[in-house]
């Protein structure tokens, strides 16, 4: 029987860890009062070393499918732009140079393109696609709401992402705030066939693909649970779910106490 292995983060003082597709290296983010820095280590935690230099804000790293590049966001030049670097720390390369906010890059399977979040158009967080060779970028999504955490499917046919797309949540009992619900969507790399695959009414995010490109793993919590997490005096609770992209069927993968975010599929 095929078993799904996951690496996930628990909300605490630690940061998101990302295992290389070869399962031999871990990439993680270290937070300090004045900077955010990327580190890399062996899969067993040994050999920890810095990947980027201190003094700048580097965050939201993502491995390329072959494991030869890491794309990340950096504010070292003043605005949030995309950079890439080899796992040994060589070949630092600035990919975008725009006054808008460019963030959350994800490589295509052939590593020739990167889908990312940007505020270049309409002052909203939409998805764009960057040609790594030419450095030309094109718009992928538009409309109301924000689109976040894009992830390219291993077969290259879909891009999964989370979006609030105008969905609002009524105020919780005794509170005046409103919070947008967030769903998981799919879109083709050419911008066609946009569809929602998560059950509406929850707060779902950080989609990741299974290796067969047939399912998406994401964290989900009920709308009411989000209030506990936001105010800090109560413990929130999320579960990781596996969503079949053909049927929309959702099955829990990891549940129980605690706020679980940013899953990474290992196999």
Regions found by a protein language model. Give the residues of each.
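Residue-level detector of Asp-centered blade-edge/turn motifs that repeat once per structural unit
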Residues: 21-22, 65-66, 109-110, 154-155, ...
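An edge-strand/N-cap motif at the start of beta-rich repeat modules
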Residues: 21-49
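Bacterial N-terminal signal peptides
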Residues: 8-17
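A flexible loop/linker signature enriched in serine peptidases of the S9 family
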Residues: 30-39, 52-57, 73-83, 96-101, ...
